């Protein structure tokens, strides 16, 4: 994400087609490190594309991704357990929460940003 942010800053500063050096300069100014391969991949993917169109396409893709609502059910079932069995259900819900956290990662959610 920091490479994308640096690219956007370069475009907003007036560079119509930022180079790898431009992005490295921006990232270096804040002490951020990145791999050259990430920068080159981004530049290859956005080459010849309009920034406004890329942002609009990204918004459309994000709008199709379902969000929220899943965690509330587990919390409600854990808190609704009565009396003596409450301890066991609380332990089960903690295990479920840990599993869910591992599943959530910085993957591409099934789509590419630049398609």
UniProtKB/Swiss-Prot annotation:
Instruction: List modified residues, type Phosphoserine.
Output: 105
Q: List, as start-end ranges, the regions of compositional bias called Basic and acidic residues.
A: 92-102
Cysteine pairs bridged by disulfides in the record:
none
Is Coiled coil given among the entry's keywords? Answer: no
Listed GO MF terms? mRNA binding; structural constituent of ribosome
**Keywords for the protein's UniProt record, in alphabetical order:** Phosphoprotein, Ribonucleoprotein, Ribosomal protein
Keyword Phosphoprotein found: yes
**What's the PTM story here?**
Phosphorylated.
Return the GO cellular component terms, semicolon-separated: chloroplast; cytosolic large ribosomal subunit; cytosolic ribosome; nucleolus; peroxisome; secretory vesicle
Q: Residues annotated as region Disordered?
A: 63-115
Any Gene Ontology biological process: response to cold
Note the superkingdom of the native organism: Eukaryota
Q: What does this protein do?
A: Plays an important role in the elongation step of protein synthesis.
What binding partners and quaternary form does the record give? P1 and P2 exist as dimers at the large ribosomal subunit.
Family listed:
Belongs to the eukaryotic ribosomal protein P1/P2 family.
User: This protein is called what?
Assistant: Large ribosomal subunit protein P2y
């Amino acid at each position: 994400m920091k490479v994308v942010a640096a690219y956007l800053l370069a475009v907003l500063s007036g560079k119509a087609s930022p180079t790898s050096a431009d992005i490295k300069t921006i990232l270096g100014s804040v002490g951020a490190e990145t791999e050259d391969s990430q920068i080159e991949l981004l530049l290859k993917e956005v080459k010849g594309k309009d920034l406004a169109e890329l942002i609009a396409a990204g918004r459309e893709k994000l709008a199709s991704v379902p969000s929220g609502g899943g965690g509330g059910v587990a919390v409600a079932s854990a808190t609704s357990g009565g009396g003596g069995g409450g301890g066991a259900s609380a332990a089960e819900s903690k295990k479920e929460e840990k599993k869910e956290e591992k599943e959530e990662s910085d993957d591409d959610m099934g789509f590419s940003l630049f398609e």
